[in-house]
Design a protein with these regions (language model features):
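Alpha/beta enzyme core
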Residues: 32, 78-111, 119-173
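Nucleotide-sugar donor-binding and catalytic loop/hinge architecture
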Residues: 6-8
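Short, hinge-like loop/turn segments at secondary-structure boundaries
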Residues: 55-59, 113-115, 155-157
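Glycine-rich, positively charged N-terminal anion/phosphate-binding segment
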Residues: 2-4, 18-93
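Alpha-helix initiation/capping motif
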Residues: 19, 115-118
Length: 173
């Protein structure tokens, strides 16, 4: 399997991004035990732009943990593209967009999985980020907002048309 220039084994093991879990120490431990790719905790685009210290610390990457993806979430294309440019300075292999978090404080504000209720905005954000950075951009999302709105088949094609290099699907709504 290959994402952009990154070659992975036939059956790669990816460490999912998890808030308050996938810090540098945990990522290094997972690499030691076989993870082929690791992700940072998800990072708020707005907090990154405001230079919130705790958020900036999430950009720390050690060479031993590579390849690494920095995952961002937000609800506005301008903020997400600016945050992606800032994240790119940390030199990750990939910029990943979180369109799958169902937590109320994220989705309830129209970010994460909340963007599954506004596909045009999700596509606008994705296009803006792809254009803003040189690094490959990937997306994590869900099958749809709820059981009556499973949109992943059409959405996957639309995201590909925006220029993403890979898509991770959390196989539920």
């Amino acid at each position: 399997m290959k994402i952009a220039d990154i070659q992975f084994p036939e059956k790669p093991l990816f460490l999912a991004p998890m808030e308050d879990v996938t810090d540098p120490a945990f990522r290094l431990l997972c690499k030691k035990f076989g993870a082929d790719m690791v992700y940072t905790e998800f990072i708020s685009a707005d907090a990154l732009i405001r230079s919130v210290k705790r958020t900036e610390q999430k950009l720390t990457i050690h060479d031993e943990e590579r390849p690494v993806a920095i995952q961002l979430y937000g609800r506005e294309a301008d903020a997400m593209s600016e945050a992606a440019r800032i994240a790119e300075e940390a030199n990750p292999e990939i910029i990943d967009l979180n369109f799958g978090c169902p937590v109320k404080k994220v989705a309830g504000k129209g970010a994460g999985a909340g963007l599954l209720r506004d596909i045009p905005k999700m596509l606008e954000i994705t296009t803006a980020v792809v254009k803003a950075v040189k690094k490959p951009v990937t997306v994590k999302t869900r099958l749809g907002w709820d059981e009556d709105n499973k949109v992943i088949i059409d959405l996957a094609e639309q995201l590909q048309d925006c220029g993403i290099t890979a898509l991770a699907i959390h196989g539920r709504t």
